[in-house]
Amino acid sequence: MAQVQYYGTGRRKSSVARVRLVPGEGRIIVNGRDIRDYVPYESLVEVVKQPLVLTETFGSYDVLVNVSGGGFTGQAGAIRHGIARALLQVDPEYRQTLKRAGLLTRDSRVKERKKYGLKGARRAPQFSKR
């Protein structure tokens, strides 16, 4: 018999995470490696676990993730977004909890482009009065 799987896609900055939830014992596998081997900061591991802890499903599902683009923070945010979306397929009742915590909203903040004539996006060259 085929195993039940739930899918969700999460995005943050330039990262895209394709998430699969499979009934299991709570392992989080990112690009074939354990989350603790993949992400160098414990705080980012907590960010990834947030939707599972909020819905009290941590330990009930194995999370299998393919993530690409961006850095560690963007990837952790994308994984969190993907897990939250996949949990909606598990039980639509989770929507209110996840929405209240802001986990279903795509964080649209991205780096602002550098403009010509400036040193950065907004930083102007030093001004000399005389």
UniProtKB/Swiss-Prot annotation:
It comes from the Bacteria. PROSITE patterns: RIBOSOMAL_S9. One of its GO terms (biological process) is translation. It holds the Pfam family Ribosomal_S9. Keywords: Ribonucleoprotein, Ribosomal protein. GO terms for molecular function: RNA binding; structural constituent of ribosome. Belongs to the universal ribosomal protein uS9 family. NCBIfam families: PRK00132.1. This is Small ribosomal subunit protein uS9. It comes from Anoxybacillus flavithermus (strain DSM 21510 / WK1). The gene is rpsI.
